[in-house]
């Protein structure tokens, strides 16, 4: 089967947005797509070139891409981006690139990228260098999702030499990026120094690595399939929490895998093996009456009533106090929304608007002073005939985790607690 025929056999959709750098790989991808329109007239193609501004020749590259796209009659978008270099130039450029693509992609378009067989080898070895498990060693797949977009990599079966030979046969030229010779970057070091030696020794090295990556991917999928019943039993999607009632009965390997599935579902960075062990020891299996927490980057993993919660880092808002005035809005601290006092015919209503939720508390009309604050320690009575009890017991009755209790607006009338908005009123 020819390169073109094998490429066309993979096309299952009609609309593609092609990531086009102007290099040999993406030029081959663009040319194969353009050629495929001859017997697939339904194909609708667009290309996008990201102008990073990192190379002195960046403007020339954009002009080259425009010329190639005009020749192949493919509409081109050229998008200039600014790179956040805090996470490194490579990662910053990658994030800026995909953000721009996401901005321009139509809802029904598949993003096509030009990763080929040798790219797969490099990705596998970089994952190996990081100590990745089978998920990382699965490297790249023909179809996946990335940054919330469907990604299509139809060149993975083909080698770079095969793609360049195709371009020569089509009389198409391409850009040579001089930064590819900079061996300070890990991928370039592998490409320029290590892999040529391995390929001289083992001519089918790239194909063998590709097979290993596929085996890892399939094993990872199988593990997920086998774990899914236990995961779905314990995972609550509404608040992204994970139940621990059955956890102690699982093997250590299953415990690790389920927690990794949970963190993946929550879209947070995966902890190292030692961190995961610490999470299980210090949080999952902490004393029943403890309120443990584990810091994971910008998130905090907490446990309450035998469930794991994932929260951001919260600021201390217990010193906040503001007076409420009718028809005036109070902005609450730490992005906790706003509170508005409304005067009705028979009463006053404190309306708390937070994210997509709205809660209220009612009070009788009067000349009293009404204020809002956070955090309260003491006893409360919810009904006239009730005994006073510690507010901690009331929060427990409503299953409110300790870290949320100081983030719920409390309404005070003449200095006395009258309501935890949206939860309970105090007699």
Curated annotation (Swiss-Prot):
InterPro entries: Lysidine-tRNA-synth_C, Rossmann-like_a/b/a_fold, TilS/TtcA_N, tRNA_Ile_lys_synt, tRNA_Ile_lys_synt_N, tRNA_Ile_lys_synt_subst-bd. Keywords: ATP-binding, Cytoplasm, Ligase, Nucleotide-binding, tRNA processing. One of its GO terms (cellular component) is cytoplasm. Pfam families: ATP_bind_3, TilS, TilS_C. One of its GO terms (biological process) is tRNA modification. Signal peptide: none annotated. It catalyses: cytidine(34) in tRNA(Ile2) + L-lysine + ATP = lysidine(34) in tRNA(Ile2) + AMP + diphosphate + H(+). It is found in: Cytoplasm. It is an enzyme of class 6 (ligase). The keyword Transport does not apply. Its EC number is 6.3.4.19. GO terms for molecular function: ATP binding; tRNA(Ile)-lysidine synthase activity. ATP binds at residues 21-26. Its main location: cytoplasm. The N-terminal region contains the highly conserved SGGXDS motif, predicted to be a P-loop motif involved in ATP binding. NCBIfam families: lysidine_TilS_C, lysidine_TilS_N. Belongs to the tRNA(Ile)-lysidine synthase family. PANTHER family: TRNA(ILE)-LYSIDINE SYNTHASE-RELATED. Ligates lysine onto the cytidine present at position 34 of the AUA codon-specific tRNA(Ile) that contains the anticodon CAU, in an ATP-dependent manner. Cytidine is converted to lysidine, thus changing the amino acid specificity of the tRNA from methionine to isoleucine. This is tRNA(Ile)-lysidine synthase. It comes from Actinobacillus succinogenes (strain ATCC 55618 / DSM 22257 / CCUG 43843 / 130Z).
């Amino acid at each position: 089967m020819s390169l073109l025929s094998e490429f066309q056999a993979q096309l299952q959709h009609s609309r593609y947005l092609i990531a086009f750098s102007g290099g040999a790989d993406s030029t081959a991808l663009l040319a194969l797509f353009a050629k495929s329109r001859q017997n697939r007239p339904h194909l609708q193609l667009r290309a996008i070139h990201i102008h990073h501004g990192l190379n002195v020749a960046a403007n020339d590259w954009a002009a080259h891409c425009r010329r190639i796209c005009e020749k192949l009659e493919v509409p081109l978008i050229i998008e200039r981006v600014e790179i956040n270099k805090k996470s490194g130039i490579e990662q910053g450029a990658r994030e800026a690139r995909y953000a721009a693509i996401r901005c321009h992609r139509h809802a029904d378009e598949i993003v096509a990228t030009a990763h080929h067989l040798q790219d797969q080898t490099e990705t596998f070895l970089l994952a190996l260098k990081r100590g990745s498990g089978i998920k990382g060693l699965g490297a790249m797949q023909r179809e996946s999702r990335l940054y919330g977009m469907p990604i299509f990599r139809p060149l993975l079966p083909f080698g770079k030499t095969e793609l360049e030979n195709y371009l020569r046969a089509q009389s198409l030229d391409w850009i040579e990026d001089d930064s590819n010779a900079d061996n300070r970057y890990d991928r370039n070091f592998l490409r320029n120094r290590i892999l040529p030696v391995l390929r001289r020794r083992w001519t089918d090295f790239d194909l063998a690595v590709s097979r290993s990556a596929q085996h890892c991917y399939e094993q990872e999928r199988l593990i997920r399939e086998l774990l899914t019943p236990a995961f779905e039993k314990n995972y609550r999607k509404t608040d992204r929490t994970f139940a621990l009632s059955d956890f102690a009965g699982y093997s250590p390997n299953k415990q690790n895998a389920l927690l990794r599935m949970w963190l993946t579902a929550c879209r947070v960075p995966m902890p190292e093996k030692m961190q995961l062990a610490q999470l299980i020891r210090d949080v999952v299996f902490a004393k029943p009456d403890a309120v443990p927490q584990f810091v994971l980057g910008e998130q905090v993993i907490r446990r309450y009533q035998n469930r794991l919660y994932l929260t951001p880092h919260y600021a201390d808002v217990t010193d906040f106090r503001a007076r409420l005035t009718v028809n005036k809005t109070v902005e609450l601290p730490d992005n906790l929304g706003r509170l508005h006092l409304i005067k009705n015919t028979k009463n006053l209503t404190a309306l708390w608007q937070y994210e997509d939720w709205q809660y209220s508390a009612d009070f009788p009309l009067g000349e009293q002073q009404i204020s809002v604050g956070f955090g309260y320690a003491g006893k409360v009575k919810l009904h006239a005939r009730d005994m006073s009890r510690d507010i901690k017991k009331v929060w427990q009755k409503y299953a409110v985790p300790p870290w949320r209790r100081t983030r719920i607006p409390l309404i005070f009338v003449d200095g006395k607690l009258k309501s935890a908005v949206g939860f309970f009123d105090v007699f």
